[in-house]
Amino acid sequence: MLDRGCPDCGFDPDYDVTSTGERARATVERWAAVLDRLGMTDRPRPGTWSPLEYACHVRDLCRVFRERLRLMLDEQDPVFADWDQDAAAVEGQYNLQDPYEVSGELAQEVRATADAFDAVTGEQWARTGRRGDGKDFTVASFAAYFLHDVEHHLRVDVRG
């Protein structure tokens, strides 16, 4: 996805990364509308998350990405702790959470993460970090990875 874009959602990784925060914030109202629908806990097919579960995932993803961004800015080439998103969904009982609470929490987390990316300047965009599986990121590529996740889940997975 970071090399050629996403054919499913149309994400182009060659966007201006300084707009990451603005674009992330632009999803908040659409996520709120998704969580206001009937059937938000319905899974479209076995093994596929419901809209509520995707919203919980994006909320938690924001927390994880914000912490990883902080590490990239504060440390030299940090290695990120693993995050098992499927285990997080089970442990957090995503599909049993209150959609109105999730909506507020998601908005807060998206905005906080957007603010964190807004604070990145100049040479900080070139700082590096790595996932436990060895995948390397710069802050710029990490921003694109984050934004793609948020926008893809909204456009493709929950049709928001």
Language-model segment annotations:
Residues A24-T27, W31-V34, A88-R127, F146:
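Acidic/histidine-rich alpha-helical segments that form the ligand environment
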Residues M1-D3, M40-A89, E123-G160:
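Short, contiguous alpha-helical
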Residues Y15-T20, L35-L38, D84, Q97-D98, ...:
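General structural signal for secondary-structure boundaries
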Residues M1-A26:
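Terminal targeting/low-complexity segments that flank the catalytic cores of oxidoreductases
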Residues V17-T20, A24, G47-P51, V58, ...:
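Hydrophobic alpha-helical segments and helix-packing faces
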Residues E22-W49:
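A glycine-rich, hydrophobic loop/mini-helix early in the fold
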Residues D12-D16, S50, E91-D98, G134-T138:
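Short amphipathic alpha-helical segments at helix-loop
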